Regions:
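Residue-level recognition of beta-strand->loop/alpha-helix junctions
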Residues: 124-128, 302, 338-340
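Secreted/periplasmic serine-hydrolase-like ester/acetyl group-modifying domain
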Residues: 58, 170-294
């Protein structure tokens, strides 16, 4: 059947009138619906992290330390800071030496400090792998609740044992916790991430929502984004993965009774970086200033470094470096202790004590006059 031109034109006109305006295939929202969506998104962005802190159970017990698997969960670290500040008068801050890399939670420095005090006064806020550049960022952006407290902060000389550890090599070096170091200034020579990654890291520090989203990914989705998680778990409900239960710190295969000599570790000839040239020492000094600016009473513990592990020339250089560090602390009226070197068999490696080593270190601190007057508020004889 052949349509006349008039009929065909009439049909085409009717079709044009019925055409849907150009748009995507997604559901279209009206102006009012867009406003509602914007309100919901804004509420989630602003209130989500705070509400989640009330929903997700976080009730640490004695000797709590951030689980090793959650070392990159800075949002949870901030939450832990708030909890610790409400329960303890003294916070012990530092890297894996404070965290207790080779010992159980009840063999750490904070545990033995509490044992010597005969009460729970000291909280373990150490995190595995936190060199001074990263620790400074962690406390600046996620440790704001640490204010008006006693703070024992440990400086590990290992971070000055080479230009690489000091982040000064021009060749790219993938160090721990790059999101926490200064992204643009001062320049860190070995840090080569793209501008977009640096900018994203800088923004995340100031927007709690991003830290919260990272927390959810790390705790519940195996530290991968949701789209990839659903690909790896096609038959699982993502909501079912959100159990509201945080992992606990496990003490599996710690080998805490194996010393460095029993492990067959040889003496080292470390190529120490002078304090005046050291980036890590510079960042550590800035962290002391930050803690003081927040009205904290700061006490620095230098070491305990395994000097038994040093070859003669390296040992001589280390003693000079240690003296320069002490001189700076004295000039700037920073209370400190450089504890005596522990017996060789109480070290696991260059900087980590074994359980008995932590017990001895705690006793050394309680016998130190500066520690007594600064942290224990006990006057000298």
């Amino acid at each position: 059947m052949k349509l006349s031109s008039t009929t065909r034109d009439k049909i085409m006109n009717e079709a044009d009138k019925a055409k849907v305006p150009f748009s995507s295939n997604n559901i279209r929202l009206s102006v009012g619906e867009w406003i509602i969506a914007a309100i919901v998104c804004t509420a989630l962005l602003c209130l989500g992290p705070a509400l989640w802190g009330r929903i997700e159970k976080f009730d640490p017990g004695a000797d709590y330390r951030l689980p090793y698997t959650l070392g990159n969960d800075y949002w949870l670290y901030g939450r832990n800071c708030r909890w610790a500040c409400s329960k303890y008068d003294t916070l012990v801050v530092g890297d894996s030496v404070i965290w207790g890399h080779y010992v159980s939670a009840d063999n750490t420095l904070s545990h033995y400090l509490n044992q010597n005090a005969a009460q729970d006064r000291f909280a373990n806020l150490g995190v595995d792998g936190f060199h001074p550049a990263a620790l400074g960022g962690l406390l600046r952006y996620y440790g704001g609740d640490i204010s008006g407290k006693n703070v024992i902060i440990q400086f590990n000389p290992l971070w000055m044992s080479s230009a690489k550890h000091d982040l000064q090599t021009e060749k790219e070096f993938r160090f721990n916790h790059p999101k926490l170091v200064p992204q643009f200034f001062p320049r860190i020579p070995c840090y080569k991430d793209s501008f977009s990654k640096r900018f994203s890291a800088a923004v995340e520090r100031y927007v709690p929502f991003f830290g919260w989203a990272s927390h959810l990914r790390i705790v519940y989705f195996e530290n991968i984004d949701l789209s990839n998680w659903t690909l790896e778990h096609p038959y699982e409900n993502p909501l079912g993965a959100v159990t509201l239960e945080l992992p606990i710190s496990r003490d599996d295969d710690l080998q805490e009774n194996v010393s460095w000599t029993e492990k067959g570790i040889s003496q080292e000839d470390f190529q120490w970086v002078e304090p005046a040239q050291s980036l890590q020492w510079r960042f550590f000094r800035q962290t002391i200033d930050l803690l003081k600016a927040r009205n904290n009473t700061v006490f620095v513990v230098v070491g305990p470094f395994n000097e038994h592990m040093l070859k003669p020339d390296s040992y001589k250089t280390y003693q000079k470096m240690k003296s320069e560090i002490q001189m700076w602390l004295q000039r700037n009226n920073v209370a400190y202790c450089v504890p005596p070197v522990l017996p060789s068999d109480l070290y696991r490696d260059a900087s980590h004590p074994l359980g008995q080593g932590y017990a001895m270190l705690a006793r050394q601190l309680f016998e130190n006059q500066s520690f007594k007057s600064t942290i224990l508020n006990v006057s000298g004889d």
